[in-house]
Amino acid sequence: MPGTTPISKAPYRMAPAELKELKEQIQDLLDKGFIRPSFSPWGAPILFVKKKDGTMRLCIDYREINKVTIKNKYPLPRIDELLDQLQGAGFFSKIDLRSGYHQLRVREEDVPKTAFRSRYGHYEFLVMPFGLTNAPAAFMDLMNRVFSEYLDKFVIIFIDDILIFSGTKEEHEHHLRFALQRLREKSLFALDG
């Protein structure tokens, strides 16, 4: 992407209900410190995708910036190898991180490239937004570093999923406690439940 002319696209048209939702979600992102007002020459449009539960997911259309981004070739594990590791395990827990990607900070020099435009203003992300081509690789790399010594022993990472597996209930309770403690130490937070 070095030397690329900044890419900026006009906002997409939105229905009145989407505009109301957009205003609320932008305010929520501002309140959480995930975004800030921007003067960046970059700017991607926004759209909403309806989730299974009927709520609206705010999506930034980063397709144009993704076309000029140098792809991180982080190796994804083979599914069959991951499944082989589960042999003999009888207890499993999947950990979801609360706003997973949003727990990763964007390097200050890259923040302007995350900019998005709306009728309510121009903003940029301070945390990793969904939709950037390298977001899954960056997140998986972080999780692999957090759990490096326990990978393939009782932790499997696949993109943004953390799977804890154990042979016995007692082992599993210990492994789960350890995994949650490790996340806490790294200031990463799991969803309750």
Each model region followed by its residue ranges:
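Retroelement reverse transcriptase polymerase core
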Residues: M1-G193
